[in-house]
């Protein structure tokens, strides 16, 4: 193979790709795993811990993330101002109302390695609460990553034919009153 034909392959290996990830109805931890792998460049053959070869990740719909169970009220985020009596705690619901991208940002920040590259990797993360993406970012996008979990269908999204075709466990008699 000549060096002329290897040049595009090498360029594609070292180039910074832009990935789109939809956060609608997805748990923040699952989004963080996918995003941290792309931000670190773990998917590239030239990956090394000391090299900065990660890609850009754009996450949309962070306002519509989903927690399982009662985590909106039970999960607590803590911080300290550094002053006496400056310990602060907020639940996930309070933090999400205040800043819709903060929960996903903190989840990804916690997944990245604790070294000097961490803040550089976070600069390549672009979070948006809705589907509105600036035009300059939109033109750079290369690939849309699959969602980690299948999004369930809401009850009002089913057609009447699908409802009638659904198998019934029990059919009430005509004179049955509720």
Curated annotation (Swiss-Prot):
Subcellular location: Mitochondrion
SUPFAM superfamilies on file: Ribosomal protein L13
GO biological process, one term: translation
Entry-annotated residues carrying N-acetylserine: 2
GO cellular component: mitochondrial inner membrane; mitochondrial large ribosomal subunit; mitochondrial ribosome; mitochondrion
Protein name in UniProt: Large ribosomal subunit protein uL13m
Pfam families according to UniProt: Ribosomal_L13
Keywords (A to Z) from UniProt: Acetylation, Mitochondrion, Ribonucleoprotein, Ribosomal protein
GO MF terms, alphabetically ordered: structural constituent of ribosome
Family statement drawn from the similarity comment of this UniProt entry: Belongs to the universal ribosomal protein uL13 family.
InterPro entries: Ribosomal_uL13, Ribosomal_uL13_bac-type, Ribosomal_uL13_CS, Ribosomal_uL13_sf
Self-association state and partner proteins as the record states: Component of the mitochondrial ribosome large subunit (39S) which comprises a 16S rRNA and about 50 distinct proteins. Interacts with OXA1L.
PROSITE patterns, per the entry: RIBOSOMAL_L13 (PS00783)
Lineage of the organism: Eukaryota, Metazoa, Chordata, Craniata, Vertebrata
